[in-house]
């Protein structure tokens, strides 16, 4: 292997070095600033068939279906921690089984948590008076949309797992606005 003489090595002048340094700095800052903007516009990937979030009770414990159903009556709607940490109602059906859907408790008007009013059998928002029927369909505004749904599946180890609802909304017959 032969040695390269000093005259054959290209000389990086001061001006070229400063241009390279300036270009590198501007590129780094621009990439750092654009990253969150680009990430915002790229939708999150789907959870897949096995994906989901285990429902948690008010104390942060996993919801065990057999224990849950013994302590709740038919028609009950009970809050659990659901997808993205949102409060989500578990629904006990008339035959004392758990419904295969959960109802997100966040009001579609301004984001208040909507409590279940058992005596009137509907969800009533305390902030601005929006009302939803027992399935979470809006019946009185100012809320523009029904409450979001999530699948509530029972696993082999008797726990509830919430997953994203992407099918047609059975209450309205329309595509889900939340997916």
From Swiss-Prot:
Question: What is one GO biological process annotated to this record?
Answer: photosynthesis
Lipid bilayer topology: Single-pass membrane protein
Its subcellular locations are: Cellular thylakoid membrane
Name the SUPFAM superfamilies on file: ISP domain (SSF50022)
Which Gene Ontology molecular-function terms are recorded?
Answer: 2 iron, 2 sulfur cluster binding; electron transporter, transferring electrons within cytochrome b6/f complex of photosystem II activity; metal ion binding; monooxygenase activity; oxidoreductase activity, acting on paired donors, with incorporation or reduction of molecular oxygen; plastoquinol--plastocyanin reductase activity
Q: What InterPro entries does the annotation carry?
A: Cyt_b6_f_Rieske, Rieske_2Fe-2S, Rieske_2Fe-2S_sf, Rieske_Fe-S_prot, Rieske_Fe-S_prot_C
Q: Which cysteines are joined by disulfide bonds?
A: 112-127
Span-the-membrane segments of this chain are 20-42
Q: Which residues bind [2Fe-2S] cluster?
A: 107, 109, 125, 128
Q: Does the keyword Translocase apply?
A: yes
EC number(s) given by UniProt: 7.1.1.6
Tell me which residues make up the Rieske domain: 60-161
Q: How is the cofactor bound?
A: Binds 1 [2Fe-2S] cluster per subunit.
GO CC aspect terms? plasma membrane-derived thylakoid membrane
Q: Could you tell me the keywords of this UniProt record? A: 2Fe-2S, Disulfide bond, Electron transport, Iron, Iron-sulfur, Membrane, Metal-binding, Thylakoid, Translocase, Transmembrane, Transmembrane helix, Transport
Catalysed conversion reaction: 2 oxidized [plastocyanin] + a plastoquinol + 2 H(+)(in) = 2 reduced [plastocyanin] + a plastoquinone + 4 H(+)(out)
Cofactor list: [2Fe-2S] cluster
Anything else known: The Rieske iron-sulfur protein is a high potential 2Fe-2S protein.
Query: NCBIfam families, per this entry?
Result: Cytb6fFeSPetC, PRK13474.1
Biological function: Component of the cytochrome b6-f complex, which mediates electron transfer between photosystem II (PSII) and photosystem I (PSI), cyclic electron flow around PSI, and state transitions.
How does this protein assemble?
The 4 large subunits of the cytochrome b6-f complex are cytochrome b6, subunit IV (17 kDa polypeptide, PetD), cytochrome f and the Rieske protein, while the 4 small subunits are PetG, PetL, PetM and PetN. The complex functions as a dimer.
Can you tell me which family this protein belongs to? Belongs to the Rieske iron-sulfur protein family.
The protein here is known as Cytochrome b6-f complex iron-sulfur subunit
The species this protein belongs to is: Microcystis aeruginosa (strain NIES-843 / IAM M-2473)
Q: Which gene encodes it?
A: petC
């Amino acid at each position: 292997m032969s040695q390269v003489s000093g005259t054959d090595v290209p000389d990086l002048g001061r001006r070229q070095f400063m241009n390279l340094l300036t270009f590198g700095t501007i590129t780094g800052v621009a990439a750092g600033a654009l990253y969150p903007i680009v990430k915002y516009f790229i939708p999150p990937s789907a959870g897949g068939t096995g994906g989901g979030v285990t429902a948690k009770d008010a104390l942060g414990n996993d919801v065990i279906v057999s224990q849950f159903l013994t302590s709740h009556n038919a028609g009950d709607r009970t809050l659990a921690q659901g997808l993205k940490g949102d409060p989500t109602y578990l629904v006990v059906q008339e035959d004392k089984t758990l419904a295969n859907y959960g109802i997100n408790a966040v009001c579609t008007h301004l984001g208040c948590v909507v409590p279940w009013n058992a005596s009137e059998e509907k969800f009533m928002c305390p902030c601005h008076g929006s009302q939803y029927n027992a399935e979470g369909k809006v019946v009185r505004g100012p809320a523009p949309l029904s409450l979001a749904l999530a699948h509530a599946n029972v696993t082999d180890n008797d726990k509830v797992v919430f997953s994203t609802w992407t099918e047609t909304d059975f209450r309205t017959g329309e595509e889900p606005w939340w997916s």
